[in-house]
């Protein structure tokens, strides 16, 4: 049983799940889980910053050789080596770069599960103060009875309030949803 109370651990499926599970097991055996996670986070940051790198990763137009050469250059320049660098190079040589963002997410889920950390996504209309963020984290920790890693997403379409997803649970306390509920009730009252 996983530390967070789930029996099966995080859901890691498909190509991304298989690659992430293999990397996690190897990193755990080599006692390099944190180093690999840090390197993958660094690469994920590069992906988020560079439209060209995202295009290289997602596009089937590039040959395997072109992808391998370009990824190798990016990894060398960023100083990403070891297990994480080899893993990314393997994904390139196997034409699986398109799944790399999902592989990184699946690896993170495995790491967090192994440490008893629960992931939560909190969508808000505008970025709250640090004090409010800490209150949200404390509330989620109390509910989960575990450490919680909060992914804060700003979504102006919510108008106000927040939407929290934690595991299989979701709480929608957004103003947008409340207004939609009022709108539906008024239509039904006609």
Curated annotation (Swiss-Prot):
Look up keyword Transport and say if it applies: yes
- Tell me which GO cellular component terms the UniProt record holds: plasma membrane; proton-transporting ATP synthase complex
The places in or outside the cell where this protein is found are: Cell inner membrane
Q: Cite the GO molecular-function annotations of the record.
A: proton-transporting ATP synthase activity, rotational mechanism
**Top-rank taxon:** Bacteria
Question: What is the membrane topology noted in the UniProt record heading this document?
Answer: Peripheral membrane protein
Q: Which UniProt keywords apply?
A: ATP synthesis, Cell inner membrane, Cell membrane, CF(1), Hydrogen ion transport, Ion transport, Membrane, Transport
How it assembles, according to the record, is:
F-type ATPases have 2 components, F(1) - the catalytic core - and F(0) - the membrane proton channel. F(1) has five subunits: alpha(3), beta(3), gamma(1), delta(1), epsilon(1). F(0) has three main subunits: a(1), b(2) and c(10-14). The alpha and beta chains form an alternating ring which encloses part of the gamma chain. F(1) is attached to F(0) by a central stalk formed by the gamma and epsilon chains, while a peripheral stalk is formed by the delta and b chains.
What does this chain do? Answer: F(1)F(0) ATP synthase produces ATP from ADP in the presence of a proton or sodium gradient. F-type ATPases consist of two structural domains, F(1) containing the extramembraneous catalytic core and F(0) containing the membrane proton channel, linked together by a central stalk and a peripheral stalk. During catalysis, ATP synthesis in the catalytic domain of F(1) is coupled via a rotary mechanism of the central stalk subunits to proton translocation. This protein is part of the stalk that links CF(0) to CF(1). It either transmits conformational changes from CF(0) to CF(1) or is implicated in proton conduction.
Entries under HAMAP family matching the protein: ATP_synth_delta_bact
What family name appears in the similarity comment? Belongs to the ATPase delta chain family.
Mind telling me what this protein is named?
Answer: ATP synthase subunit delta
């Amino acid at each position: 049983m996983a530390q967070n109370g789930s029996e099966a651990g995080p859901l890691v499926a498909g190509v991304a799940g298989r690659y992430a599970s293999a990397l996690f097991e190897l990193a755990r055996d080599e006692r390099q889980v944190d180093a690999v996670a840090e390197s993958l986070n660094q690469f994920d940051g590069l992906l988020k910053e560079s439209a060209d790198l995202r295009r290289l990763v997602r596009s089937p137009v590039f040959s395997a050789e072109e992808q391998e050469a370009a990824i190798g250059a990016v990894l060398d320049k960023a100083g990403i080596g070891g297990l994480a660098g080899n893993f990314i190079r393997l994904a390139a040589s196997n034409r699986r770069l398109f799944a790399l963002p999902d592989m990184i997410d699946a690896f993170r889920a495995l790491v967090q599960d192994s440490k008893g950390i629960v992931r939560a996504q909190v969508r808000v209309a505008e970025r709250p103060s640090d004090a409010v963020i800490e209150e949200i984290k404390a509330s989620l920790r109390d509910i989960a009875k575990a450490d919680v890693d909060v992914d804060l997403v700003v979504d102006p379409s919510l108008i106000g309030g927040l939407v929290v997803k934690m595991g299989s649970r979701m709480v929608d306390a957004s103003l947008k949803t409340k207004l939609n509920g009022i709108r539906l009730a008024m239509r039904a009252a006609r």
